[in-house]
Structures are given as C-alpha cells and as structure tokens.
Amino acid sequence: MAPNLRKSHPLLKMVNNSLIDLPTPPNISAWWNFGSLLGICLMTQILTGLLLAMHYTADTTLAFSSVAHTCRNVQYGWLIRNLHANGASFFFICIYLHIGRGFYYGSYLYKETWNTGVILLLTLMATAFVGYVLPWGQMSFWGATVITNLFSAIPYIGQTLVEWAWGGFSVDNPTLTRFFALHFLLPFMIAGLTLVHLTFLHESGSNNPLGIVSNCDKIPFHPYFTLKDILGFTLMFLLLTTLALFSPNLLGDPENFTPANPLVTPPHIKPEWYFLFAYAILRSIPNKLGGVLALAASVLILFLAPFLHKAKQRAMTFRPLSQLLFWVLVANLFILTWVGSQPVEHPFIIIGQLASFTYFTILLILFPIIGALENKMLNY
C-alpha cells in the first residue's frame, strides 16, 4: 500500500499535524475562532499592503498625492486602500477578543504561548503605528511627532534616541522613508512569530472552556474546525467589506485628509481607536516619564498574567466573582478608549485618571485576591 503523502512528505506532514490531524478539544467555542481569524487578517493585510506599496512613494513631497493617486486612478485602488485601513481595525478587534478569551479561560498558563502572543501584540502595535504615518496627512505627521517624542523622556539617552529615530531634528523625509521600510518588514516578522506561537501551542494542545485536561476526548481538526473556521472567515469578511464599502472613513480621523503641515497643529491629536486606551493611560499622568512608563506598563502587564493567577481552577467558567471583575475590567477599557478620544479638560482628566488607576488595581491586586478568596470558598 502506497504511503499517505499527507503523512509522509516532510512539508505536508507539518501542515497535516497543525491543520488537519491536529487533536483538538471537542468543546472549544467560537471564542477559539479568533486565532485563525488573526491569521486570515495577516494574510489579507500583507496582500493588500503589497498592492498598495506598488503605487506608494515614500517621500514627504509625494506620499500624500501618491495615496490620493492610488484611490483615484488605480484599478480598485480605493477598495484596496479601504480594505487595508479597515483591515487593521479588524486585526485589532480580533487580537483584543483573542487576548480577552485567553484571560477569561486561563490560557495564559501556557506561558511560552502567552509570552510569544504578547510579543506579537507589541509587534502589531508597532506595525500599525508606523503604517499610520505613511499617508502623510496631518494626524499622521503629528501622531508620529507626539509618540516618537515620548522616547525623549528616557533619562540620559532620550534626546539622542529620538533624533536617531527621526534621522534629523524633526519628523521629516528620513523618518517617513524608514517608517515605510519598517512597515514593510514587520508583518513578515509577525508571520514568523506566529509560527513560533503555534509551535508552542501545539506542544501543549489547546485549552478549552472548562479549563480541564481534555486529552482523553479529542477530535481531529479537519473537518470539524476547518468548517467552523470558514464560517468565522465568512462573517469577518462580510463585516470588513461592509465597512470598507459603506463607511470606509468611519474609524479614521478627518484631519488626515489634510496634507501634513509642520506649522499647523491639529486641535486634538489622537491615535486610531485601537490605541486610545493606552493613550488615555499615558495622558492620565501629568509627568512625561511617568506617563511613558504607565503607557508601557499598560501592555507589558500582560506578561505578569501567569504569575498573578492564584485560583485553583484554571478558567473563570465556574468562578462568578472573577467573572464579575473581568467584565468590570472590560467596561473600564471601554471607558479608557472613550476618554482617550476626548480633549484634555474637566471632567475627562479625572475620569481618565480613575479609569487608569482602576485598570492597574484590577489586574495587579484584585484578581489575585479574588482568586485566593474563591479557593477559600471551595472549602465550604
């Protein structure tokens, strides 16, 4: 009998073991769809990005008009650009839901998988930031100026670091050129890290909604979850195309329709919606270095999740107090996102400070305490 090529071929064997014959818990819910959705997002972004890069010019005098030219004169250029810009939003929606799922069900106890995931998030944030600068509109320019300027808060080496990043004494042509190079490079780095992420995941196997070992009860990934994933893809593409075709500028900033002008500062400088929660935390501290540290901590705190887990049960499925706290944290993140989009004035300043304080308190103090309390409750 001839050997099964899918199981014997050196390359196909790897694909088979990760996408076809992969033993999967039978009870994973739709919350487990977001990993594959992120993969599809990445592929879509690389494809649309490549097509956009073919028509883009990374020069301060031409960048804005080259993007306008793509939208006006290139076949379906407007569609490619809208899919790429809104695809970034969907990428972040998926990654935030994916992280939320991991947090709720205790998936962070697979430390290597979790840590590579956090590194992926940081790389994605860097990619989105440098990408937002490329159209060279007002918000692109001032966003780049404000965020890169934060590095100057680092003691001793800060100013040198910023000038080195800018390639001069302000955000200018060298900055745009290197940001384009980075924006082209980073997605491939994300793709590489994704393989590392999956390698670590397949060492342990997937977690499941009950947070218990399911080795005795697994089913093959194909056809069950391939079909389930295709349903997820269809729904996401439906939402993405609807957004890109009906209201492509809904999530963008109108300020970015004005070409970059270093002499005119926009009234409210704010990043894209997916960074607003971190931006609100940055603004809530009146000291520059303190704000930068809080901004970094807001994302890096995810690395601490495995060490702050004090509960005997893995998932929050049967832990009502932790569930309540989790949803308070989610609501808190929505408040931070909203505050980040508002001007720096009363009452938004105090709301932002309270929400930032609550964010860190919940993650660092309340979750471990509630976990330990629930352990005590198991005895009664």
Curated annotation (Swiss-Prot):
Cofactor remark from the record: Binds 2 heme b groups non-covalently.
Q: Record's superkingdom?
A: Eukaryota
Q: Which UniProt keywords apply?
A: Electron transport, Heme, Iron, Membrane, Metal-binding, Mitochondrion, Mitochondrion inner membrane, Respiratory chain, Transmembrane, Transmembrane helix, Transport, Ubiquinone
Location of this chain's protein in the cell: Mitochondrion inner membrane
Any idea which positions bind heme b b562? 84, 183
> GO annotations under biological process?
mitochondrial electron transport, ubiquinol to cytochrome c
Q: A single GO molecular function, which one?
A: metal ion binding
Q: Where does a ubiquinone bind?
A: 202
Membrane-topology annotation of the record: Multi-pass membrane protein
Required co-factor(s) are: heme b
Record-annotated membrane-spanning stretches:
34-54, 78-99, 114-134, 179-199, 227-247, 289-309, 321-341, 348-368
Sites binding heme b b566 sit at 98, 197
Function noted in UniProt: Component of the ubiquinol-cytochrome c reductase complex (complex III or cytochrome b-c1 complex) that is part of the mitochondrial respiratory chain. The b-c1 complex mediates electron transfer from ubiquinol to cytochrome c. Contributes to the generation of a proton gradient across the mitochondrial membrane that is then used for ATP synthesis.
The UniProt similarity line reads: Belongs to the cytochrome b family.
Additional notes on this entry: Heme 1 (or BL or b562) is low-potential and absorbs at about 562 nm, and heme 2 (or BH or b566) is high-potential and absorbs at about 566 nm.
Record protein name field:
Cytochrome b
